[in-house]
Regions:
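Solvent-exposed soluble domains appended to multi-pass membrane proteins
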Residues: 1-332
Length: 332
């Protein structure tokens, strides 16, 4: 996208030091990355880190320093405040270039046992055998997210610039296993079929635009294809790799660590013999070429003409060595 003139912004309202986020977003090519430290400032960040398990204390700090901001829901930055910050950056963008933002929210993150005065539970699971407090808290948090997302869509509905928004969940919440067992119709999660085990980790995604796009309902699609689908929907020039993934998704719409599903809905475990072995082997080699075989990477496949990828950093080389070592241990 940078080769096509886009400026890029990343927002994750949590600590930047975790998982080396600053280095990661820089290596991914983002022009700017905003984390919790940038929102709070250094002194308040230290206070937050020291009292992270006490949402009422944190709310008091926010009330003193950011009165009326609605910054927190429980102990995390709310989706409403997050979206306001996203809109603020959009409004202050370089208007001479197209704009791309990648935003990982924090509002609904676990755990789900701590009470907070700034959170009101409003949604409850029905038709279940007992009360599940964690599930109810998470369901109520989703309602807050729905309201915040509605506000974001309403804002960009009134923006003249053509805009595409993709919203997706990165993982399922850590709630009561009994609740999950009930809604999946099994006595114990250890009794799940491979297909049920895979469906347990499904999350929804939604693509919206403030102009007419082709409406469609996609039954299943694994996350390795999602970025290519968004680029295609937005009319952005695709790399050969993006095109390859979109074609692969028509054959195997789901590929994940549990197995894969073909276009007819047939499920395969990785240990199964299937008619797709050669296709998957080819995919693995292409992935390896892109991620690890940097000296021989096919630039015409993975990048738009005119873009030069960043050189490998020392940390990347160390990470590759560690991965190889881990694989040797696993194979031993």
């Amino acid at each position: 996208m940078k080769a096509q003139g886009y400026s890029s912004f990343a927002l994750h309202p949590y600590y930047k030091a975790g998982w080396k986020r600053t280095e990661v977003y820089e290596n991914l090519g983002f022009d700017k990355f905003i984390g919790l430290e940038d929102i709070l400032g250094p002194e308040l960040t230290d206070e937050f880190q020291a009292n992270g398990s006490d949402p009422d204390y944190l709310q008091g700090l926010v009330d003193q320093n950011f009165p009326g901001s609605g910054m927190l829901l429980r102990q995390y930055v709310s989706d409403k405040y997050n979206n306001d910050r996203l809109i603020e950056d959009y409004e202050n963008r370089d208007k001479s270039t197209p704009y791309f933002a990648f935003n990982v929210t924090m509002q609904n993150h676990g755990g789900y046992t701590i009470s907070a005065q700034n959170f009101e539970e409003s949604i409850y699971a029905t038709n279940v055998s007992k009360t599940y407090p964690k599930a109810n808290k998470y369901l109520s948090l989703i309602k807050y997210t729905d309201d915040a997302f509605k506000g974001l869509v309403e804002y960009f509905s009134n923006v003249e610039e053509p805009t595409v928004i993709c919203m997706f969940g990165d993982h399922q919440p850590s709630i009561e296993t009994g609740f999950i067992s009930e809604i999946m119709g099994v006595d114990n999660l250890s009794n799940l079929t491979p297909e049920q085990e895979q469906s347990r980790y499904c999350t929804p995604f939604y693509i919206w635009a403030n102009y007419d796009i082709e409406e469609q309902e996609i039954e299943r699609l694994s996350s390795n294809y999602l970025s290519s689908l968004v680029l295609k929907t937005a009319g952005i020039k695709l790399t050969e790799y993006n095109k390859y993934l979109l074609n692969l998704s028509k054959i195997l719409p789901v590929i994940d660590n549990a197995g894969y599903i073909d276009a007819e809905g047939n499920y395969y475990k990785w240990s199964d013999n299937s008619p797709y072995t050669d296709i998957l082997d080819e995919y693995e080699k292409i992935q390896y070429n892109n991620i690890f075989d940097r000296e021989n990477v096919d630039l015409d496949t993975f990048y738009i003409e005119g873009y030069t990828p960043p050189e490998d950093t020392e940390e990347t080389e160390v990470a590759e060595e560690k991965t190889e070592t881990d694989e040797e241990v696993g194979n031993g």
